[in-house]
Amino acid sequence: MTRYEVVFIAIPTLGNLVPQVEFANLLTKHDPRFSATILTVSMPQRPLMNTYVQARASSAANIKLLQLPIVDPPAPEQYQTLVGFLSLHMQNHKHHVKHALLNLMKTTESNSSNSVRLAAIFVDMFSTTLIDVAAELAVPCYLFFASPASCLGFTLDLPRFDLAESKSEFTVPCFKNLLPRSVFPNLVLDAKDGTFWLSYHARRYKETKGIVINTLQELETHALQSLHNDSQLQRVYPIGPILDLVGSAQWDPNPAQYKRIMEWLDQQPLSSVVLLCFGSMGSLEANQVEEIAIGLERAGVRFLWALRESPKAQLEYPRDYENHKDVLPDGFLERTNNIGLVCGWVPQAVVLAHKAVGGFVSHCGWNSILESLWHGVPVATWPLYSEQQMNAFQMVRDLGLAVEISVDYRVGADLVRAEEVENGLRSLMKGGDEIRRKVKEMSDTCRGALLENGSSYSNLVSLIQELTS
């Protein structure tokens, strides 16, 4: 029997690495002929990444995680944005990726008991410089896109936008409605190197043999049809939702806090708690924290608030506060003691699955949106960075699957007032029956897509047929 090896590599962010690892897990479980090697890239500024990798390596079957040697980071004068840094950082790993692939090819060739073939390498959205290595070694290369299909379409269309125009709205084929300039990513609006790198990667996407997207046909029907109409693209495979449903519960950096959170949730009524969580890279300034606190207190809803301190350095993740009283209004914790819990890092996937949780104030990272839809928990949108403003716009305006607190918020430039927070929370937790119904329907649809003969299941079968042909 011929066996197949697939290789994956992603930038060192949880939002990109985790879904890629889960896709490798899905692929190898679906077809036991496949095994996977994940090439991981370390960043000393992000120890949480190493915690995840070590935990996943010990629990993964048929998946091997291989740490690439550490390389010198790009010099500060070489980049202006995080995407610029990450793109160059991945480019600097070319030699080590080539060495790893050559070793894998030698191993597969020397396997006398079974025929083993290196079937493909999957790069992520900011690792396209590694397509050169795949081409040099004649290894089929695919793109694994961890963001929505709408974001992929926007990125591919980016070169045709004239941002010097004074237009406030743009026609973007992957969106049903005109897309406001105000929800464009900061990378595009800032006069830095972000647009260059996004356009560079978009051009290279078209060199891959196919694009695997963490979405499903029934969720992003319009965007996926738009991509299908692009004759320059190879086949697109929507195979989601790909989720780590255990999440950080299996590698939580603070097990005592995890226990405290879950015990508190166990004591709350059904669907009564709103989770406020802004992702692994999300944090807010002190004046915004104060407005949220006032809005929460006025709304009177039960809440679990993952409140984290802004990073001290550019490439670091936020960290837990030593004392939340340092940033919250005087007496807030005491006044809300009976209805709320303020904490640091939360095991988001497990919390969203808890029966007490009935709403989610989210930064609208795509993984978080998919988790909320899977568990049937309605979202109130509060985007912070990356493509999250566009995700929020799509969820609220195009799909009608979310309540709006903001769709175009930007840290440091905007302030959502306590009244807006209060109104958004009330709408999410005490109204929004139509959105709640639609989210529950989409939850059932997400689960059905992964079952035999479901849309994502069928696309995975088609991908496997191509990989093994």
From Swiss-Prot:
UniProt-listed InterPro entries: UDP-glycosyltransf_plant (IPR050481), UDP_glucos_trans (IPR002213), UDP_glycos_trans_CS (IPR035595)
Gene3D superfamilies, A to Z: Glycogen Phosphorylase B
Keywords: Glycosyltransferase, Transferase
Sites where the protein binds UDP-alpha-D-glucose: 280, 345-346, 363-371, 385-388
Signal sequence residues: none
Lineage, uppermost ranks: Eukaryota, Viridiplantae, Streptophyta, Embryophyta, Tracheophyta
Organism per entry: Pueraria montana var. lobata (Kudzu vine)
Family: Belongs to the UDP-glycosyltransferase family.
Name of the protein this chain belongs to: UDP-glycosyltransferase 43
